[in-house]
C-alpha cells in the first residue's frame, strides 16, 4: 500500500517492548468463562529505558519523523483500494470498508491501476496457495508474510476466495502474517477485534496481555473444537520484561477514552508493543522494525509454532521495502532467501527510461514532496537490475521472473489476466486512459523469486526490449526551438491541431500562418475553445526564451456556431478547409457530428464552422487521413458506444461517408487509436500504411499493413491490404522488436513523401517507448518492405533558457506540419501520472524536418521561426442561426447562376449480409441500407400477380383503404378518404390505376392491436419469411404490415421504431432525410407527419425548393422485388411508386430498451418516445412560468431558452 495513492508503511525504528525469545510474554485467551485482568503495568525496553508514545518525539528523531510520514500515507492508499473493491468486486465480501470510514470513488485510471496491482499480487498468492507441492516441500505449512502490510486485507480476501487452498478452519492450514510499524499494527489489531466480519473467520484468537485491546465488545470467535465468545475486552499490559532493571510498578487502571475520535488523536499511554500482538490459527500480527531482522525472525518463528523448516514461505512486499535505505531492503531480500523453501513477491517502481522521463520525474518529485522518497529505484531502475538484485541475494539457484505491470497486462501465457477478463473490465466503468495506464504500468514491476525452481518454470523466455539503440538504428539529432507560453495557457491534451493561412491586410497580401489547437482536455475539464498561435521571425543569434508575445498583423475570429466540447477527435487538412470528425465527451458518450472549418466569404481573418455529413455511428480515437490532394478522406476504425468500429469509410464531400468494401484475403484487425497515412495517389486509387491500434482484448495489435483504395466507383470504394515486413536498420535483424516499435496506440503518422513517413509518439506493447525512439522516420518500398530509416532525437536549440521544460511527453499532443517549410510543431499534450500529478508539455516546440540525408550525430539547423500564443478563442456550439446564402449548399447542392439550386441526393448504399451479426451491426450504426440477396420466400415470385394475392387473402375480405383524388396524399390535410371495400375489388382498382393505398390493420382489434401479417393474413403469410440474417427483427418484433398501393405518394413522415421495408412486387422510389433535418421539413410540434410534398418541392424552382435543396440532406433508394430497406428510427421518409402498383411487407421492431418507449396503446408503432412526451409537458410548464412577465421579457427569455435547447440538441450527437 502506498501514498496519496502511493506510499507504504514498511517498518519502525522502535525497539521491542519485550525481548521476544529471552522472556516469553504472558498471554490471554478470551472466552465467556474468562475475563481479562484489568491491571496494567509499565514495560521497559531491552536497554532498560521506559518506552513512550509521544507524537512530538518525532521532531527530535528525523528517522522516526520520516517513518511517521510513510505510515500516515496508508490512509490514502486504502481509500483507492476500497474504491476498487466496491466497483470491481461487487459479489465478494468487502473488507477494506472496515478500514475506510467513507467511500470515495476514484478516477477510472486510479481504479484500473490499483485493480491490476491488487490482481497481480492476488494471482501470485493464489498460485502459491493452490500449488501442489512434492518432495521435501510436501506437507509443509504455507505461510504468507505481508511485509509492510498497512491496512491491506489480503488474509481475509484469500480466506474468502480460496477456502480450500487455505484449508480454512484447520490448524495446519495456510497462515497469514502481517508485519508493519508497531503503531500501525496496533490500530489494525483494534479494528480486527472490533469488527465481527474480520474476527469471525479466525479461530483460537489469542492477544498477548502486553498488547492493548479495545474496550468495546468483540465479535464471536470460533475455535477448532469449541465456540468461544469475547463479551468484553479491556486494555491490559503484561508484567515487565525479565530484562527490566526496575521493580514492577503497581498496576493502574487504564483510562477509557470519552470517544473514539479523541482517543485516536491522543498519545497512547504506553508504547505500541513490538513483536506478536495478535495470533490465531489463520492469522498473526507482528509489530516490528524490518531493519531488526533478528526480532522479525524470532517473532516469525514463534508465529509458526517454533519450527521454520516445517513451513514454506511467501513474502509479499507491495511497494513497501523501497522506502527503506537500500542496504536494509536488500538485507530483507537476502534474509528471506535463507529460510529454506521460500518465495518472494515484490512490487515496486522502475525508471525504465531514466529519471528525466516526464512520468518518472513527476513520480520522483511526488514522493520527495511527501518526504517519503522511494530509494530502491535509484539502484534498481530496470527489470534487468531487479533480476540481478535477487539472483545475487540467495535466489539464484531457483528462478527469478520479473514483469513490468504493462508486460503482465499482455503476458502471452495469460499468467495474470486473459483476453476475456480484460474485456470484462470495460464493463465495470468506461475507460479511455490507455496511454496513462501504459505509462504507469511501465514504471512498476512485479518480481516473483523462488529459492527452489519448479519443473519447467525455471526460466523466463527472454524476448528482448524494443530499443533503437540496441537495434543499431541510425540517429539524427534534430534541433528544436522551444517557445514558452506563460501560465497555464496552451495546456490541453487530446485536442486536434491545424495550420490555417490568412492574407495580411497589408498591400503585399502576405499570407500569415496561424496554428490552432482545437478543444481537448484542459487542466480541469474538456474545453469549448481553441488556442491560436502566430508565427514570428527568429534571428540567427536569437536565443529568446519565448516569453515575449508579439502582435501579429492578422486577427483571428470565429463566426458563431460550431462543434460542442470534445476530445479524441480528428482534424484533417484539406488545404482550404479543415474537416473535424467525431470525438467524445466521456468515454461512454462518443460523437458522430462532423464539421468543416472554412474561411468566410469576403473575410481574410474570419473563419466559420459548417456542419457536414455525420458519421454513420458516433466514434472517437478513429484514424483519418487525407487522400492525396483531394477533398476526400479515409477513416479507419474507432471506438463507438460499446464496440470497436470494424469498417473503413470514405468521406466524399457530396456523398458523405461511404462504407468501403474490404476485399482480398488479408483483413485488418478492428482497432482504435491506430496510425494511418496516405502516401501515394494514382488516377483512381490511393495507397498508404496502417499500423497498430488497440483491439477489443485491450492489447495493441501486431499489425503492419499496406492498403490500397480503389475509388473508380466512388459510391462503392474497395480497399485491399498487404502485410508488411520490417527491415531493421541496414541488416534486417530483430524484426519482432522493430515491429513493436512501429505498432503503437495513440501515435500519429505524418506523410513526408511518396515513400517516407514519420511515426510520432504514442505507446507500445509490453514496454515503455524509449525517448530516443518516439519519433521514427520510416520508408515503404513497393515490394512491401518497411524500413526504419532513422530515429529523430530532439535536441533543444535554446536549452540555455532557464525556463526550458526539458523532455516532452509525446502523449495527447497535436503534431502539425506546416505546408510551406515542412516544420513539425508539437503543441499541447501531457498525461495524468497515475495518482502522482499531471505532467503538461509547456509551450510549443518546432522541429525542422526539411533535412538533407542524415548523418549520425549531425544536427539539423535551428528552425527559423518561433511561435507566440495570441489568444484563446471560444467556439459557440450549435449551427449558425442564419440561413445559408444563395448558391451556398451545405449538403453538396450546386448553385446555378440564375439562383436556382440543383439538389444533390446521396444514394443509399446497397450491401449483402453474411450473417445475423452483420445486420445487428447495421442497426447499431443507425444508417439506412438496402439489403440485397435475401431469401424472403415464395412471395417475391408470386405476389406480382394481383389475382394470386386476392385469392390468397380472399376476394370478399373487407379492408379499409385510402382513396385519394391527387397523386400526393397528405395526412395533415386529409386529402383522401377512408373507404371500406372488398380486397378483390381493391386489387382490381389498383391494377386499373386508381389512386388507392392499403396500410393493413389488425383484423381482430384494429384500434387496439398492431398488425401482424401471420395473424391478419395467415394464408398469405406462408409465402413470406424473415431470413435468418434478420433474426434480430424477429426477436424484437412489434408488427408486420402488408402495404399495397397504386400510383399515389405516401406522405412524408417518420417512424419511432426501426423497421425493414421488404419490396415484394412492383417498385418504389424512397426519399429519406436524416433526423437532424426535421426542423426544415414542416413537422408541427407533436406531429409525426408533414404536409410537404417532397417530390414536387425538392426538385422545383420555388424559393421553398431552393431552401430545401440548401439545408436538407436527402438520401434515395429505388426498391425492386427482393430488396429490403433498413429504415432507422426517426429517419424522415416518403415514397412514390415507379411501377403501376406496389406490394410490400413492412416489419417494425424495437431497437431501443423497453423503458424508452411511451407507455400505453400504440397501434402503429409511431408514438413518440417517452422522453419527448414528458419534455413537451415540461415545456408547457416552463412557458407558463413566464406568464406573469411583460410580453417583451417573456419573449426574450423564452427565445434564449429555445436557443439553449437548440445548442444542446446540436451538441449532443
Swiss-Prot record:
Keywords: Methyltransferase, S-adenosyl-L-methionine, Transferase, tRNA processing. Signal peptide: none annotated. Pathway: tRNA modification; wybutosine-tRNA(Phe) biosynthesis. It holds the Pfam family LCM. It is an enzyme of class 2 (transferase). Its EC number is 2.1.1.290, 2.3.1.231. Residues 1-13, 39-52, 215-248 have a biased composition (Low complexity). Residues 1-76, 215-272, 879-900 are annotated as: Disordered. GO terms for molecular function: tRNA methyltransferase activity. It comes from the Eukaryota. Residues 1006-1166 form the JmjC domain. Residues 53-67 have a biased composition (Basic and acidic residues). Coiled coil: none annotated. GO terms for biological process: tRNA methylation; wybutosine biosynthetic process. It catalyses: 7-[(3S)-3-amino-3-carboxypropyl]wyosine(37) in tRNA(Phe) + S-adenosyl-L-methionine = 7-[(3S)-(3-amino-3-methoxycarbonyl)propyl]wyosine(37) in tRNA(Phe) + S-adenosyl-L-homocysteine; 7-[(3S)-(3-amino-3-methoxycarbonyl)propyl]wyosine(37) in tRNA(Phe) + S-adenosyl-L-methionine + CO2 = wybutosine(37) in tRNA(Phe) + S-adenosyl-L-homocysteine + 2 H(+). S-adenosyl-L-methionine binds at residues 117, 148, 180, 289-290, 318. Belongs to the methyltransferase superfamily. LCMT family. Probable S-adenosyl-L-methionine-dependent methyltransferase that acts as a component of the wybutosine biosynthesis pathway. Wybutosine is a hyper modified guanosine with a tricyclic base found at the 3'-position adjacent to the anticodon of eukaryotic phenylalanine tRNA. May methylate the carboxyl group of leucine residues to form alpha-leucine ester residues. This is tRNA wybutosine-synthesizing protein 4. It comes from Neurospora crassa (strain ATCC 24698 / 74-OR23-1A / CBS 708.71 / DSM 1257 / FGSC 987). The lineage of its organism: Eukaryota, Fungi, Dikarya, Ascomycota, Pezizomycotina.
Amino acid at each position: 500500500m502506498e501514498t496519496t495513492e502511493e506510499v507504504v508503511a514498511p517498518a519502525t525504528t522502535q525497539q521491542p517492548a519485550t525481548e521476544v525469545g529471552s522472556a516469553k510474554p504472558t498471554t490471554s485467551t478470551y472466552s465467556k468463562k474468562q475475563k481479562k485482568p484489568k491491571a496494567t503495568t509499565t514495560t521497559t525496553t531491552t536497554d532498560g529505558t521506559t518506552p513512550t508514545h509521544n507524537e512530538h518525539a518525532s521532531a527530535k528523531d528525523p528517522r522516526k519523523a520520516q517513518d511517521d510520514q510513510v505510515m500516515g500515507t496508508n490512509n490514502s492508499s486504502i481509500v483507492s483500494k476500497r474504491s476498487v473493491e466496491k466497483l470491481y468486486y461487487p459479489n465478494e465480501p468487502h473488507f477494506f470498508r472496515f478500514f475506510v470510514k467513507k467511500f470515495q470513488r476514484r478516477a477510472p485510471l486510479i481504479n484500473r491501476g490499483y485493480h491490476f496491482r491488487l490482481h497481480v499480487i492476488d494471482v501470485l498468492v493464489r498460485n502459491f496457495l493452490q500449488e501442489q507441492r512434492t518432495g521435501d516441500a510436501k506437507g509443509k505449512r504455507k505461510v504468507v508474510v505481508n511485509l509492510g502490510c498497512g491496512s491491506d486485507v489480503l488474509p481475509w480476501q484469500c480466506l474468502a476466495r480460496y477456502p480450500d487452498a487455505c484449508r480454512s478452519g484447520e490448524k495446519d492450514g495456510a497462515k497469514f502474517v502481517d508485519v508493519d510499524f508497531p503503531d500501525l499494527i496496533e490500530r489494525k489489531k483494534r479494528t480486527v477485534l472490533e469488527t465481527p466480519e474480520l474476527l469471525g473467520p479466525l479461530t483460537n484468537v489469542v492477544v498477548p496481555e502486553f498488547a492493548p485491546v479495545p474496550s468495546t465488545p468483540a465479535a464471536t470467535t470460533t475455535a477448532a473444537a469449541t465456540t468461544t465468545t469475547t463479551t468484553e475486552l479491556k486494555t491490559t499490559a503484561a508484567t515487565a520484561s525479565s530484562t527490566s532493571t526496575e521493580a514492577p510498578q503497581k498496576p493502574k487502571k487504564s483510562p477509557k477514552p470519552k470517544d473514539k475520535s479523541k482517543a485516536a488523536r491522543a498519545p497512547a499511554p504506553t508504547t505500541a508493543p513490538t513483536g506478536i500482538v495478535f495470533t490465531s490459527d489463520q492469522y498473526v500480527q507482528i509489530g516490528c522494525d524490518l531493519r531488526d531482522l533478528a526480532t522479525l525472525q524470532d517473532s516469525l518463528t514463534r508465529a509458526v509454532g517454533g519450527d521454520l523448516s516445517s513451513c514454506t514461505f511467501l513474502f509479499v512486499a507491495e511497494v513497501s521495502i523501497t522506502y527503506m535505505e537500500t542496504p536494509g531492503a536488500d538485507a530483507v531480500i537476502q534474509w528471506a532467501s535463507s529460510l529454506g523453501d521460500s518465495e518472494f513477491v515484490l512490487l515496486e517502481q522502475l525508471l525504465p527510461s531514466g529519471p528525466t522521463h516526464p512520468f518518472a520525474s513527476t513520480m520522483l518529485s511526488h514522493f520527495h514532496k511527501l518526504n517519503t522518497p522511494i530509494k530502491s529505484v535509484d539502484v534498481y531502475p530496470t527489470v534487468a537490475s531487479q533480476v540481478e538484485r535477487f539472483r545475487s541475494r540467495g535466489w539464484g539457484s531457483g528462478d527469478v521472473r520479473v514483469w513490468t505491470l504493462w508486460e503482465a497486462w499482455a503476458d502471452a501465457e495469460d499468467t495474470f489476466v486473459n483476453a476475456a477478463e480484460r474485456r470484462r473490465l470495460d464493463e465495470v466503468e468506461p475507460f479511455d486512459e490507455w496511454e496513462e495506464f501504459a505509462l504507469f504500468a511501465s514504471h512498476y514491476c512485479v518480481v516473483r523469486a523462488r529459492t527452489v525452481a519448479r519443473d519447467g518454470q525455471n526460466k523466463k523466455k527472454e524476448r528482448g526490449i524494443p530499443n533503437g539503440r540496441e537495434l543499431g538504428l541510425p540517429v539524427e539529432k534534430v534541433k528544436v526551438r522551444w517557445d514558452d507560453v506563460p501560465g497555464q495557457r496552451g495546456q490541453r491534451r487530446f485536442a486536434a491541431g491545424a495550420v490555417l493561412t490568412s492574407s495580411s491586410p497589408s498591400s503585399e497580401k502576405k499570407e500569415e500562418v496561424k496554428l490552432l489547437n482545437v478543444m481537448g482536455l484542459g487542466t480541469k475539464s474538456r474545453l469549448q475553445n481553441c488556442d491560436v498561435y502566430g508565427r514570428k521571425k527568429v534571428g540567427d543569434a536569437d536565443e529568446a526564451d519565448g516569453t515575449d508575445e508579439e502582435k501579429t498583423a492578422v486577427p483571428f475570429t470565429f463566426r458563431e456556431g460550431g462543434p460542442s466540447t470534445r476530445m479524441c477527435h480528428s482534424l484533417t487538412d484539406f488545404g482550404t478547409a479543415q474537416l473535424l470528425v467525431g470525438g467524445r465527451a466521456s468515454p461512454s458518450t462518443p460523437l458522430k457530428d462532423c464539421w468543416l472549418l472554412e474561411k468566410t466569404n469576403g473575410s481574410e481573418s474570419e473563419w466559420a464552422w459548417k456542419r457536414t455529413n455525420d458519421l454513420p455511428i458516433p466514434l472517437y480515437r478513429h484514424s483519418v487521413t487525407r487522400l492525396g490532394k483531394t477533398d476526400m478522406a479515409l477513416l479507419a476504425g474507432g471506438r463507438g458506444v460499446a464496440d470497436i468500429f470494424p469498417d473503413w469509410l470514405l468521406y466524399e464531400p457530396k456523398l458523405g461517408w461511404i462504407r468501403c468494401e474490404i476485399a482480398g484475403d488479408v483483413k485488418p484487425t478492428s482497432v482504435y487509436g491506430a496510425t494511418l497515412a496516405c502516401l501515394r495517389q494514382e488516377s483512381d486509387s490511393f495507397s498508404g500504411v496502417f499500423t497498430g491500434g488497440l483491439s477489443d482484448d485491450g492489447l495493441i495489435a501486431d499489425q503492419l499493413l499496406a492498403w490500397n483504395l480503389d475509388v473508380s466507383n466512388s459510391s462503392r470504394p474497395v480497399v485491399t491490404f498487404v502485410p508488411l515486413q520490417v527491415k531493421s536498420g541496414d541488416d534486417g535483424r530483430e524484426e519482432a522488436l522493430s515491429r513493436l516499435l512501429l505498432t503503437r496506440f495513440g501515435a500519429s503518422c505524418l506523410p513526408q513523401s511518396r515513400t517516407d513517413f514519420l511515426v510520432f509518439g504514442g505507446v507500445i506493447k509490453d514496454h515503455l517507448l524509449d525517448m530516443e525512439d518516439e519519433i521514427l522516420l520510416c520508408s515503404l518500398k513497393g515490394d512491401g518492405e518497411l524500413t526504419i530509416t532513422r530515429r529523430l532525437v530532439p535536441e533543444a536549440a535554446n536549452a540555455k533558457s532557464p525556463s526550458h521544460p526539458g523532455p516532452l511527453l509525446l502523449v495527447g499532443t497535436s503534431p502539425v506540419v506546416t505546408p510551406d517549410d515542412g516544420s513539425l510543431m508539437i503543441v499541447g499534450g501531457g498525461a495524468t501520472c497515475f495518482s502522482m500529478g499531471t505532467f503538461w508539455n509547456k509551450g510549443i516546440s518546432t522541429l525542422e524536418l526539411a533535412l538533407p540525408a542524415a548523418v549520425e550525430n549531425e544536427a539539423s539547423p535551428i528552425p527559423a521561426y518561433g511561435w507566440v500564443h495570441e489568444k484563446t478563442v471560444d467556439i459557440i456550439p450549435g449551427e449558425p442561426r442564419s440561413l445559408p446564402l444563395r448558391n451556398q449548399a451545405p449538403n453538396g447542392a450546386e448553385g446555378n447562376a440564375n439562383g436556382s439550386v440543383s439538389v444533390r441526393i446521396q444514394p443509399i448504399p446497397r450491401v449483402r449480409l453474411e450473417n445475423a451479426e452483420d445486420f445487428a451491426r447495421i442497426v447499431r450504426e443507425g444508417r439506412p441500407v438496402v439489403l440485397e440477396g435475401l431469401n424472403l420466400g415464395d412471395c417475391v415470385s408470386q405476389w406480382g400477380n394481383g389475382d394470386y394475392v386476392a385469392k390468397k387473402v380472399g376476394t370478399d375480405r373487407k379492408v379499409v383503404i385510402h382513396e385519394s383524388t391527387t397523386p400526393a396524399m397528405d395526412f395533415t390535410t386529409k386529402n383522401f378518404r377512408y373507404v371500406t371495400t372488398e380486397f378483390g375489388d381493391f386489387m382490381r382498382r389498383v391494377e386499373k390505376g386508381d389512386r388507392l393505398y392499403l396500410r393493413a390493420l389488425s383484423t381482430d382489434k384494429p384500434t387496439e392491436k398492431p398488425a401482424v401479417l401471420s395473424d391478419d393474413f395467415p394464408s398469405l403469410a406462408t409465402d413470406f419469411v424473415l431470413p435468418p440474417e434478420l433474426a434480430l427483427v424477429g426477436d424484437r418484433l412489434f408488427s408486420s404490415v402488408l402495404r399495397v398501393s397504386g400510383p399515389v405518394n405516401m406522405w412524408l413522415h417518420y417512424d419511432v421504431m426501426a423497421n425493414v421495408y421488404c419490396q415484394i412486387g412492383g417498385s418504389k422510389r424512397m426519399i429519406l432525410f436524416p433526423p437532424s433535418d426535421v426542423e426544415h421539413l414542416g413537422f408541427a410540434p407533436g406531429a409525426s407527419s408533414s404536409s410537404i410534398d417532397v417530390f414536387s418541392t425538392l426538385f422545383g424552382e420555388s424559393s421553398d425548393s431552393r431552401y430545401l435543396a440548401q439545408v436538407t440532406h436527402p438520401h434515395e433508394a429505388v426498391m425492386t422485388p427482393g430488396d429490403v430497406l433498413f429504415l432507422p428510427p426517426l429517419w424522415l421518409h416518403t415514397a412514390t411508386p415507379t411501377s403501376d402498383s406496389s406490394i410490400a411487407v413492412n416489419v417494425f421492431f424495437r431497437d431501443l430498451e423497453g423503458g424508452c418507449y411511451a407507455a400505453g396503446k400504440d397501434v402503429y408503432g409511431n408514438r413518440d418516445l417517452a422522453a419527448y412526451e414528458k419534455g413537451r409537458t415540461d415545456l408547457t410548464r416552463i412557458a407558463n412560468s413566464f406568464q406573469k412577465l411583460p410580453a417583451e421579457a417573456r419573449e426574450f427569455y423564452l427565445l434564449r431558452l429555445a436557443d439553449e435547447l437548440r445548442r444542446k440538441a446540436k451538441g449532443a450527437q
